[in-house]
């Protein structure tokens, strides 16, 4: 006989470990265990059978994989946590004894840890880090807009804001912005970096009330990890673009208007990126080839001629037949006779339509418009920005320079006011939404709908469902509404005519119906007598007739509702589904039906509104 198997030595009981057991095994506090799990990406698991995993107990506990906890035993950060625990005891003892000098020495040599090796473990390739960049950006932008409180220091907020501005400066310089959406929560942006779509949310800079039930220890742990990750990513991106990281900050501009203009991006050669960018744009717009001198052209033609003669001699030596067929060689004309120049078209650095959308425009942004949003968006699309706030600061600090400025080159003025009293000739006045909608569509939309004081068209999310309700389909809706109105009018006229005919023929039909009812009663009485003579009940005959009628109705319904080949294939697929798949399919169909009903409801409301507007115009 084999040995009796011991309890809780295999299966769920061995594969899973509770949080209390894990803390005892690692010999750390609960707070350090949470930090370690966040850094390493280890999260609780749900076993199939909790009772077996907990060795027969049904108490609610948190489980982890035993292999994950065993993996944490060799983590260098865990050793630093233990060193910090010892350091805290020594520091407390020194302060208790009043040994200030020894306490200062201990504080200077406090154990420090880095998360660089963890970043390399969790993200072995650069694309893996880019794919997981959405949450870090959202967390950093959240903290950058938060006020300083007891649990969140000013330094943490300043560091988060600096990292966020480094990111925005890179995206705007490389013109990587593709889509954006202004929502209630904030502004959503999407950039494409090395083929990976990165989407993040920037909250509005409003006064915020911080809730008391938020555990900032966990959030700060995530922030620490995300800051390290974003530093890695930015260092790689800046280096690949030939830029110095971190970029230089212009303190004077930062104190004045601030914004992205205060972050000066410099190449590794020591040149300002703005000058290089201008040269690249000029080169992209006017592509010219390299001109060859006359001496170089003569040498090239002579070498070509000598090579041609040498080829003909070699061909003549190879021919052994007495008669040689003469062939006419192609004559290559010299392109320099027409003063032509060899050109080599260079690929443009900014290939997407949004990268050069505003490259020919200079925008003047009023003080009532959020500068941080529009500055980033316009610079990311190749435009230039002049803000009213910076002009006011320049007027106060340097009046001579302000007087020498030429503002005639401004093409667009962005304003969020109903009326503009003094308009400058030559400028196009628009509302901020014109910029956002142009970016989402990838082309310049009509300016007329976005003039100051006009009712703006709906600002839709570029990530919405394609089959959902589209309020912009105005022309299509109005055309359909007109067709339906005509059809409804025709149907109403036909119904009125039919009612008149029915009223006219009503008296004649009443007499016929009375006669038919009398005949039916006579037939029923005769059948009852026949059934009594035969010894059968009349109710059995009646039930049989009703059953035959129902069968006929079912046959007619089945013939009317003949299934198409696609519907038949769907029905066959449903038969082959499992119960789980059928439930999931029903849920999907319910969601699709709900969505279509919602779209139909909204389109119906839209048609009614269009009809009312049309009636008001006619009046």
Swiss-Prot record:
- Places the protein is found: Nucleus, Nucleolus; Nucleus, Nucleoplasm
Gene Ontology CC entries for this record: nucleoplasm; PeBoW complex; preribosome, large subunit precursor
Output the CDD domains linked to this UniProt entry.
BRCT_pescadillo_like
Disordered as annotated region, ranges: 303-324, 456-567
Q: Where is the composition biased (Acidic residues)?
A: 312-324, 480-522
Molecular function via GO: large ribosomal subunit rRNA binding; ribonucleoprotein complex binding
Q: What residues does the BRCT domain cover?
A: 353-452
Query: What are the entry keywords?
Result: Coiled coil, Nucleus, Ribosome biogenesis, rRNA processing
Q: A single Pfam family, by name?
A: BRCT_2
Lineage, top-rank taxon, reads: Eukaryota
List the residue ranges forming a coiled coil, or say none.
472-560, 588-619
Q: Name one GO biological process term.
A: maturation of LSU-rRNA from tricistronic rRNA transcript (SSU-rRNA, 5.8S rRNA, LSU-rRNA)
Q: Where is the composition biased (Basic and acidic residues)?
A: 523-539
Q: Which InterPro entries match?
A: BRCT_dom, BRCT_dom_sf, PES
**Subunit structure and binding partners:** Component of the NOP7 complex, composed of ERB1, NOP7 and YTM1. The complex is held together by ERB1, which interacts with NOP7 via its N-terminal domain and with YTM1 via a high-affinity interaction between the seven-bladed beta-propeller domains of the 2 proteins. The NOP7 complex associates with the 66S pre-ribosome.
Summary of the function given for this chain in its UniProt record: Component of the NOP7 complex, which is required for maturation of the 25S and 5.8S ribosomal RNAs and formation of the 60S ribosome.
Which protein family is named in the record? Belongs to the pescadillo family.
- Spell out the protein name for this chain: Pescadillo homolog
Species source reads Lodderomyces elongisporus (strain ATCC 11503 / CBS 2605 / JCM 1781 / NBRC 1676 / NRRL YB-4239)
């Amino acid at each position: 006989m084999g040995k009796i198997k011991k309890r809780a030595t295999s299966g769920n009981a061995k594969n899973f470990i509770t949080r209390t057991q894990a803390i005892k095994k690692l010999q750390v506090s609960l707070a350090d265990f949470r930090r370690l799990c966040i850094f390493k990406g280890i999260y609780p698991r749900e076993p199939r059978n909790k009772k077996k995993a907990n060795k027969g107990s049904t108490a609610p506990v948190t489980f982890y994989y035993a292999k994950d906890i065993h993996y944490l035993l060799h983590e260098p950060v865990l050793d630093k946590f233990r060193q910090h625990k010892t350091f805290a005891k020594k520091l407390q003892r020194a302060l208790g004894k009043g040994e200030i000098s020894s306490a200062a020495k201990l504080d200077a040599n406090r154990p420090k840890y880095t998360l660089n090796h963890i970043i390399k473990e969790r993200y072995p390739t650069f694309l893996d880090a880019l794919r997981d960049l959405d949450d870090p950006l959202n967390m950093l932008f959240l903290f950058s807009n938060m006020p300083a409180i007891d649990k969140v220091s000013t330094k943490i907020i300043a560091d988060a804001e600096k990292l966020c501005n480094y990111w925005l400066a890179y995206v705007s310089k490389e013109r990587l912005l593709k889509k954006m959406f202004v929502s209630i929560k904030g502004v959503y942006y999407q950039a494409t970096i090395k083929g990976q779509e990165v989407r993040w949310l920037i909250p509005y800079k409003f006064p915020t009330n911080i809730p008391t039930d938020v555990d900032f220890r966990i959030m700060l742990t995530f922030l620490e990890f995300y800051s390290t990750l974003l530093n890695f990513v930015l260092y790689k991106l800046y280096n690949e673009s030939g830029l110095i990281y971190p970029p230089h900050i212009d303190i004077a501009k930062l104190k004045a208007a601030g914004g992205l203009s205060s972050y000066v991006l410099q190449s590794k050669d020591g040149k300002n990126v703005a000058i290089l960018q201008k040269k690249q744009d000029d080169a992209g717009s006017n592509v010219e080839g390299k001109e060859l001198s006359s001496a170089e052209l003569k040498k090239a033609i002579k070498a070509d001629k000598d090579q041609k003669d040498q080829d003909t001699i070699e061909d003549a030596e190879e021919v052994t037949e007495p008669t040689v067929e003469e062939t006419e060689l192609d004559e290559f004309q010299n392109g320099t006779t027409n003063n032509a120049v060899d050109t080599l078209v260079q690929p443009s650095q900014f290939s997407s339509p949004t990268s050069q959308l505003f490259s020919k425009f200079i925008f003047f942004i009023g003080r009532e418009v959020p500068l941080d949003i529009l500055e980033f968006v316009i610079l990311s699309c190749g435009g230039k920005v002049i803000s009213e706030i910076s002009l006011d600061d320049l007027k106060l600090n340097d009046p001579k320079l302000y007087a020498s400025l030429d503002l005639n080159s401004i093409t667009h003025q962005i304003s969020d006011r109903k009326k503009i009293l003094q308009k400058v000739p030559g400028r196009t006045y628009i509302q901020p939404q014109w910029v956002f909608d142009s970016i989402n569509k990838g082309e310049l939309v009509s300016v007329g709908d976005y003039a100051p004081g006009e009712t703006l068209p709906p600002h839709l999310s570029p990530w919405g469902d394609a089959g959902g309700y589209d309020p912009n389909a105005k022309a299509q809706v109005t055309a359909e509404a007109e067709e339906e109105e005509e059809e409804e009018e025709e149907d109403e006229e036909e119904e009125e005519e039919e009612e008149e005919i029915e009223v006219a023929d009503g008296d004649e039909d009443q007499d016929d119906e009375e006669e038919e009812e009398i005949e039916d009663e006579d037939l029923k009485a005769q059948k009852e007598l026949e059934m009594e003579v035969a010894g059968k009940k009349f109710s059995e005959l009646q039930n049989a007739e009703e059953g035959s009628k129902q069968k006929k109705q079912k046959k007619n319904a089945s013939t009317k509702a003949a299934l198409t080949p696609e519907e038949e294939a769907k029905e066959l697929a449903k038969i082959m589904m499992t119960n789980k798949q059928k439930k999931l399919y029903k849920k999907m169909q319910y969601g699709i039906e709900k969505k279509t009903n919602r779209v139909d409801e909204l389109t119906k409301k839209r048609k009614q509104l269009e009809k009312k507007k049309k009636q008001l115009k006619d009046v």
